[in-house]
C-alpha cells in the first residue's frame, strides 16, 4: 500500500473539486464514473469496491443526509487514494484513524472535499467550537476537527480541537 502525504491528499481533493465543480458527492461520483448503490448494509455505513473494473460505492440506505454525504466523500477518497487495495470487502470503522492509515487518508479526503475552508475559517474567527461549526455546516465534529488540524499544520495558527475516533461505534 502506498501511503499518501496530507499534502497529496489535499491536492487531489482540491483538484476534484475544481474539475467536478461541486461538493455534491453524487455529482462527484457521476463526474468520476463511480457507480452508486444504496443497499441495506447491516454493520457498515459504506463500502468501496472495484468489481470487474467497475468502480462501485455501496452505501447504507437509511443514513441521515449528513452522514450519507460524509460516508460518500470518504468512499470517494478510497476510490481516489486506494483503488488498487479495493479488491475485497473490508470492514473498518469510518472514524477509526488510529489503526488504519487508509481510513485516516479517506477521512482527510472527506474533510477536504466536504468542508469549505473559507466558511470554516469565518466560524473559527467568530469563536465557535468544532461541534457548533459542524452543526452549522451540516457536518460532523470529528470531520471539522480533522480539517482544523490540517489547516493548523498548513498555514493557520489554530488550537487543534480534540476528537474521538470511535464515536460511530
Question: What name fits each language-model region?
Answer:
Residues 1-169:
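Active-site hotspot residues in diverse enzymes, especially metal/ion-binding acidic/histidine motifs
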